[in-house]
């Protein structure tokens, strides 16, 4: 049973997605009824969090077993006697899985309320406490120490500082207020600490605020697959084109044993600074991060550019990650997306610009991994079909490990090509209802299967560059 409504989308966006998922190939492969059922299930799953919290171990500083032991100690501090398993993924040896319990349906709602923004609400559903910047409104007489019910303003309609809100709101659980209403709205403008400490969340997951920051990196499971598929080797020169906040960059450097060079680009300075901070925290020295627009990363003559930095000469890199800017429609939980159809469809041209640059920067024999955290056909399988048509030098490659499902039909790719893709589709598994008793009885294999299926929507394609493109690639 679903505890939240399906993701709220503008009608034109929902129709666009529906047409994509009910394309002629998809309907003929099963039936229209089955394709519709799968699409509606996907919309419901998107509003609920994944069943597992995934943490990647920084193997540069510690062994997986050592860090697993530290993590178990931390969970005991947070949950006391409740036994929460920490499972090592067999195909992703540096990844640990921690099951989430919930949804808990018998939580008593309190008279005092706090309304939080949708982004804050999504974080609460994955184990976070409520931080002051996320609080939009609070009950008139709320004091520090009060037990408060927390709600998410999924449509962004609540006014900052309101004393009550009757619009659409979704219950997230109860917590204890660390501050009074007056402290929050009339206090210092730069308050950033915890405002509500969640004690009875609908979904119970560990809080990772400042937990083992040099040893673990919170990352969605499909995102951890990307660097393994890339398979970087010590001594190579790697480019991560759209790198912030650095999960895939730092993973790549760790897999290379911090030997070689990982160049990370992002065009927003604050994000680049965060990436540098993460690399430093994880003790990685092979990463060089630059604030730079990756669409301009190809050097057109020998005079421009930062020394050792962008733009770069053609065919400079052994391997490239293009985790492309995308519509992000696979992120979970996400109860509402207010984007227009124009916004949702605006990413395909940008992704193609980036692919043009990536192909020219990659050495012959080099590997390009393209990924997105979205579910649209246009940004995933259609981009693969376009790339294969546009760049005869590219060959689609099988992926290792292969954890996601095969690609979606509808872009004109062959069945063999679809099998070489990875599409993570959360609609393939029913909503889980996990409590501490069922956790104790759960088999390790079942938890791993669930982690592989009940994750965010994501897509991965792997290409091999078979010949040089030193002659200019035509823009199509």
UniProtKB/Swiss-Prot annotation:
Disulfide bonds: none annotated. Residues 111-203 form the PUA domain. Its EC number is 2.1.1.-. InterPro entries: MeTrfase_RsmB-F_NOP2_cat, MeTrfase_RsmB-F_NOP2_dom, PUA, PUA-like_sf, PUA_sf, RCMT, SAM-dependent_MTases_sf. The modification N6-acetyllysine is found at residue 419. Its main location: cytoplasm. The active site is at 373 (nucleophile). S-adenosyl-L-methionine binds at residues 242-248, 266, 293, 323. GO terms for biological process: tRNA C5-cytosine methylation; tRNA methylation. It is found in: Cytoplasm. GO terms for cellular component: cytoplasm. One of its GO terms (molecular function) is tRNA (cytidine-5-)-methyltransferase activity. It is an enzyme of class 2 (transferase). Coiled coil: none annotated. Gene3D superfamilies: PUA domain, Vaccinia Virus protein VP39. Keywords: Acetylation, Cytoplasm, Methyltransferase, RNA-binding, S-adenosyl-L-methionine, Transferase. It catalyses: cytidine(72) in tRNA(Thr) + S-adenosyl-L-methionine = 5-methylcytidine(72) in tRNA(Thr) + S-adenosyl-L-homocysteine + H(+); cytidine(72) in tRNA(Cys) + S-adenosyl-L-methionine = 5-methylcytidine(72) in tRNA(Cys) + S-adenosyl-L-homocysteine + H(+). SUPFAM superfamilies: PUA domain-like, S-adenosyl-L-methionine-dependent methyltransferases. Pfam families: Methyltr_RsmB-F. The PUA domain plays a role in tRNA recognition through precisely recognizing the CCA end and the D-stem region of tRNA. Belongs to the class I-like SAM-binding methyltransferase superfamily. RsmB/NOP family. PANTHER family: NOP2 YEAST -RELATED NOL1/NOP2/FMU SUN DOMAIN-CONTAINING, TRNA (CYTOSINE(72)-C(5))-METHYLTRANSFERASE NSUN6. S-adenosyl-L-methionine-dependent methyltransferase that specifically methylates the C5 position of cytosine 72 in tRNA(Thr)(TGT) and tRNA(Cys)(GCA). In vitro also methylates tRNA(Thr)(AGT). Methylation requires, in the acceptor stem region, the presence of the 3'-CCA terminus, the target site C72, the discriminator base U73, and the second and third base pairs (2:71 and 3:70) in the tRNA substrates. This is tRNA (cytosine(72)-C(5))-methyltransferase NSUN6. It comes from Mus musculus (Mouse). The gene is Nsun6.
């Amino acid at each position: 049973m679903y505890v939240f409504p399906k993701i709220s989308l503008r009608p034109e966006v929902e129709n666009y997605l529906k047409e994509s998922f009910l394309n002629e190939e998809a309907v003929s492969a099963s039936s229209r009824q089955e394709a519709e059922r799968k699409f509606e299930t996907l919309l419901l799953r998107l509003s609920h969090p994944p069943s597992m919290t995934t943490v990647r171990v920084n193997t540069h500083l510690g062994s997986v077993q050592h860090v697993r032991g530290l993590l178990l100690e931390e969970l005991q501090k947070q949950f006391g006697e409740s036994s929460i398993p920490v499972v090592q993924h067999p195909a992703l040896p540096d990844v640990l899985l921690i099951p989430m319990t919930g949804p808990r349906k018998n939580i008593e709602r309190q008279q005092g309320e706090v309304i939080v923004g949708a982004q804050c609400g999504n974080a609460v559903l994955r184990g976070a406490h409520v931080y002051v910047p996320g609080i939009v409104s609070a009950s008139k007489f709320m004091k520090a120490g009060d037990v408060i019910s927390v709600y998410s303003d999924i449509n962004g309609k609540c006014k900052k500082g309101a004393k009550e809100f009757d619009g659409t709101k979704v219950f997230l659980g109860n917590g204890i207020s660390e501050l009074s209403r007056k402290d929050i709205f009339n206090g210092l403008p730069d308050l950033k600490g915890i405002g509500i400490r969640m004690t009875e969340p609908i979904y119970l997951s560990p809080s990772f605020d400042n937990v083992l920051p040099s040893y673990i990196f919170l990352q969605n499971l499909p995102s951890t697959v990307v660097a393994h598929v890339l398979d970087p080797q010590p001594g190579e020169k790697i480019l991560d084109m759209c790198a912030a906040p650095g999960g895939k960059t730092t993973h790549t450097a760790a897999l290379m044993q911090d030997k070689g060079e990982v160049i990370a680009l992002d065009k927003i300075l604050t994000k680049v600074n965060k990436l540098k901070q993460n690399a430093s925290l994880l003790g990685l020295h092979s990463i060089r991060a630059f604030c730079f627009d990756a669409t301009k990363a190809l050097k057109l003559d020998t005079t421009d550019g930062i020394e050792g930095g962008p733009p770069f000469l053609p065919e400079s890199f052994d391997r490239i990650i293009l985790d492309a800017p995308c519509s992000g429609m696979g992120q979970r939980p996400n109860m509402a997306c207010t984007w227009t159809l124009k916004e949702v469809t605006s990413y395909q041209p940008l992704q193609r610009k980036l692919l043009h640059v990536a192909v020219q920067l990659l050495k012959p024999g080099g590997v390009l991994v393209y990924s997105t955290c979205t579910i649209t056909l246009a940004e995933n399988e259609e981009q693969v079909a376009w790339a294969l048509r546009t760049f005869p030098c590219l060959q689609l490659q099988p992926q290792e490990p292969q954890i996601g499902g095969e690609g979606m039909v509808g872009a004109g790719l062959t069945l063999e090509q679809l099998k070489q893709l990875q599409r993570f589709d959360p609609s393939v598994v029913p909503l889980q209802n996990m409590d501490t008793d069922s956790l104790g009885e759960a088999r390790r294999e079942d938890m791993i299967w669930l982690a592989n299926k009940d994750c965010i929507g994501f897509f991965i394609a792997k290409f091999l560059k078979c010949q040089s493109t030193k002659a200019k690639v035509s823009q199509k």
